[in-house]
Amino acid sequence: MTTNPDIVKQTKNEIHQVTSRVQEKLDSKSTNAVEQNNNSSQASVTKDNKKKAAKRAKKKAAKKKKQSAAASASSTPVEEAQHAQEEQQEQTILQEPGFTQTIVEKDADQVDEPLEPIASSALGTVEPPTDNKPSASTSTAVPTTEARNTSITEPANSPSSSSSSASTKSTATTQSADYVVAEHFAPQRNDEQLGNSPASITSKPATTSAAQPSSKVEENMAKATSQPITTAEKEIPELKPIEPEAIMISKEINTTHDQAAATTTAAVASASTTATAESHAVADGIMNDNVLESIGENVQQETVFEDASDIPHADVIPHTTTVTVEEESPIALGQGGVTHEATTSARASASGIPGAFEEVQQTVQEDLPHPTAETVEIARFAEQPVRAQQPEQYESSVVQEATETVTDVGKGVSSTVKNEVNVPSTIPTESENPVAVGGTTAEHPVQEAVTAPTETAHDFSKETTTASKRVSKHDKASAEKHKVARKPSSTGQEPTTPSTPAKSAQSSKHARRPSKQASAPSSPGTTSAAVPGGKKSAIEAAAPIPTSADTVESKHAAGSGSATTIPSPGSATTKPTPGSATTKPTPVSATEEHAAGTTKPAPAAGATATAENETADGKAQTATDGEAAPKKSWFKRMKKSFGKLFH
């Protein structure tokens, strides 16, 4: 890292230009300020001082009267002489032309502090206060002006001791721009650093007024003057060490690199490494940062190597790795885990170490199954540890879990499909797909999904078996069957199971048809507005049907020997008993059903036209009619998106 001498020269020139401009500005500002201060302070301060002196004189006169009356016996001629000196001194102060010191108005019982003038030296110093103690030779009574000038004790070698005078007029006018610029660029020195200089001996004056030149400027001037440095001298020591400093910096960087390399080598060469203290040094080449963060007391490593100086730091391989996997850790979320990473790097870097790769591989086999796409779901079903060669058990557990968590009737099938779409498992063959019971018409969305030889067929067929599992599990509770059967019908499909409950549902519909038709003439005293011809009025058809009534009626039908899972079409009964004096469960014709519009709820809106038309392919009509039609479009969209994925 070398420095161009041209750049150094250019920098010097720029600094010279800047300092000269600053010097000119400070020259003009300081001269203007000094003139203004001299003009204003001579006029205003003398007026203020005269007013304040008059007040003080009145107070002191009253004070003298009190003192003379109280302590007339103890008064001595020395004290009277001191009082006379004080009065004479006040007049002298007011007559001095360049005096800018404010006389502070004090209480009657306060002791006067000595007033220090601003001494001017040959260098034009403005002497600031450095400590609060009054000088040694000043007494309680303020001496005269001559006594005050001589009371500033200065060492013999002081440059200002020979030329100290009582006149302070030349103080501000002798401000040199060199000193101002030097003060501007010089580091701020505090009063302790000024301890040995001749400027630090005088005592602190009383409070200064606003009309006086700023005490900060005077203080800075004094600091700069105590160690005089001109502007030209100031630049050169700053610019001189640039080139050697650059070389030193580069040397420091190289030394730091060498030391860091030596430290790393020493850390790797240690015989055994504890997991908490130095796990980063050993495990850095094997595990990623996520795993390193989760390393705690669960990982214990012993380092295997032939000669520590011959093996680079990244090639050291721990031969025993014990990993405790939690569900929240990144290992359980399919990132491969510690052992998978260890296997990969061991295969790459263990060629020089005999036996190391076999040990790592063995550890992988023992601790975790090989990470596959199923690792995501293993964390959810931790009570059933699943290997990759057991897809049947895994599939059934996922379907069972997803189905058991569904409690809402209306959203059951859709949420089950969501849970199962993300599950990668074995694709069943064509023979494994259960055949739909309700006919083979193209309108049935599940039938299309089953016959399509893609993974979409697998997902929806699993959904079908889900419904059958729910039916067979709750075989004894007919109300639960009713809820399960309504779940697929609300999304536009039927449970296509080869088991008996769905067939019994089909047969029960044929068995229920004559009972409903027989109940119509057997109740002549009906209170409902029955239309001749076995049809309901439009008001009844449009009336909302409560879900509890459907459940009660299906319970009644199940009690009479049928195992129905489909709600009665168009039923508006409030009491399920056939032949009662309440509203008859008369089937609704297709005309009135469509005239009723969308005010009918889901079970009645999905009903078929009449009871006579309720044949085997009535299921297809039920699935596509009424409210279930938009749900079918959802299945079509799902099929379309999955077809894009898998083809």
Curated annotation (Swiss-Prot):
Chain intervals with Polar residues compositional bias: 29-46, 92-103, 146-155, 193-215, 390-406, 413-432, 488-508, 561-589
Disulfide bonds: none
GO CC annotations on file: cell division site; cell periphery; plasma membrane
Phosphoserine sites (modified residues): S162, S165, S197, S200, S396, S489, S490, S515, S519, S523
Sites of Phosphothreonine modification: T168, T491
Purpose: Has a role in meiosis and sporulation.
Keyword line: Meiosis, Phosphoprotein
Start-end of Basic and acidic residues biased regions: 232-241
Biased amino acid composition, Basic residues: 49-67, 633-647
GO biological process, one term: meiotic cell cycle
Record carries keyword Lyase: no
Region (Disordered): 1-241, 387-647
Name this polypeptide is given: Meiotically up-regulated protein C8C9.04
Compositionally biased region (Low complexity): 134-145, 156-177, 518-530, 596-613
